């Protein structure tokens, strides 16, 4: 029997952490971060980690598990998340995956093989390279490759191209989980307002000092490439004013949120909830209760 888990995804600043904590309290659960940047110690403000108080109220996992000089990959995430979920389940609790790194979460849920002749990172990189293509462009690539896909859809096209590219069937190897995937969303202008406000709050909380510490110590590591830090480096180099750097960060975060939504919409089977609608949290909790009781 597959393990039932709750997955909460959505764009940055939409309220994933708050909902995950509420779900954990309601259903005796623990939160597993699905965020590629929250693994780094010392990067707290720019990655929007749950506060110490929130982490004390509900156990959180895969936060602060790497130094900023260390790399972290989808392979690492899947391996560590599997062990974490198994541990949570063994204690009779519910695992709640919450985060915005779609590639990591999708790899976990769909059970992609992490070994074999083709390195997993190469497979993931190829999948990510196909993501920007429109449906028409993907159809053209399929045609060029001499492939036939009855009832074309995006997922089938990407799968067929992947098999053709690597010369082997990389179909899911072992699906361990039965997930309920909840995707939070908001009306676009409201979401962008939330993002702008969050960035302002981050600066008030000390983001500039945190980013400067990263810039001074390790400006070229993987951890420094995340949204929230690299946008401020031109300011530290004297290439932009502070206001220009802050606006650059807001703009980059808005674009990132748009890419996140595109990923969840096209690559994962999610149930969308508009956070601005009345009673939305109650509806989500009811759906989770029905899912767990089924």
UniProtKB/Swiss-Prot annotation:
Record's keyword terms, sorted: ATP-binding, Magnesium, Nucleotide-binding, Transferase, tRNA processing
Residues annotated for substrate binding in this entry: 12-17
Organism domain of life: Bacteria
The protein's name in its UniProt record: tRNA dimethylallyltransferase
Co-factor(s): Mg(2+)
Residue segments, region Interaction with substrate tRNA: 35-38
Record's subunit section: Monomer.
Listed InterPro entries: Dimethylallyltransferase (IPR039657), IPT (IPR018022), P-loop_NTPase (IPR027417)
Catalytic reaction list: adenosine(37) in tRNA + dimethylallyl diphosphate = N(6)-dimethylallyladenosine(37) in tRNA + diphosphate
Function: Catalyzes the transfer of a dimethylallyl group onto the adenine at position 37 in tRNAs that read codons beginning with uridine, leading to the formation of N6-(dimethylallyl)adenosine (i(6)A).
Family per similarity comment: Belongs to the IPP transferase family.
Organism: Streptococcus pneumoniae (strain ATCC 700669 / Spain 23F-1)
Regions annotated as coiled coil: none
Binding-site residues, ATP: 10-17
Residues of the site described as Interaction with substrate tRNA: 101, 127
The keyword Transmembrane appears for this protein: no
């Amino acid at each position: 029997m597959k393990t039932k888990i709750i997955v909460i995804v959505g764009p940055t600043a939409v309220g994933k952490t708050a909902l995950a904590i509420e779900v954990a309290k309601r259903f005796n659960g623990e939160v597993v971060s699905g965020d590629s940047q929250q693994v780094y110690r010392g990067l707290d403000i720019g990655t929007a980690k749950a506060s110490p108080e929130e982490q004390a109220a509900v156990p959180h996992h895969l936060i602060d598990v790497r130094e900023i000089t260390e790399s972290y990959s989808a392979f690492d995430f899947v391996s560590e998340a599997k062990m974490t979920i198994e541990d949570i389940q063994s204690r009779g609790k519910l695992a709640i995956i919450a985060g915005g790194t779609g590639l990591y979460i999708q790899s976990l849920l769909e059970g992609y093989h992490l070994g074999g002749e083709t390195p997993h990172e190469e497979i993931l990189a190829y999948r990510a390279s196909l993501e920007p293509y429109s449906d028409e462009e993907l159809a053209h690539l399929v045609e060029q490759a001499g492939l036939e896909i009855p009832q074309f859809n995006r997922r089938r096209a990407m799968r067929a191209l992947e098999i053709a590219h690597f010369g082997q069937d990389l179909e899911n190897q072992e699906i361990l989980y039965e997930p309920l995937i909840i995707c939070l969303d908001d009306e676009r202008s409201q979401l962008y307002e939330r993002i702008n406000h969050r960035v302002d709050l981050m600066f008030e909380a000390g983001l500039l000092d945190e980013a400067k510490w990263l810039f001074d110590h390790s400006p070229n590591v993987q951890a420094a490439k995340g949204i929230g830090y690299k946008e401020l480096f031109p300011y530290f180099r004297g290439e932009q004013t502070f206001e220009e750097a802050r606006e650059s960060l807001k703009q980059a975060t808005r674009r990132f949120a748009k890419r996140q939504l595109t990923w969840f919409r096209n690559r994962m089977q999610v149930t969308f909830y508009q956070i601005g609608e009345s009673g939305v949290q109650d509806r989500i909790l009811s759906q989770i209760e029905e899912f767990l009781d089924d």
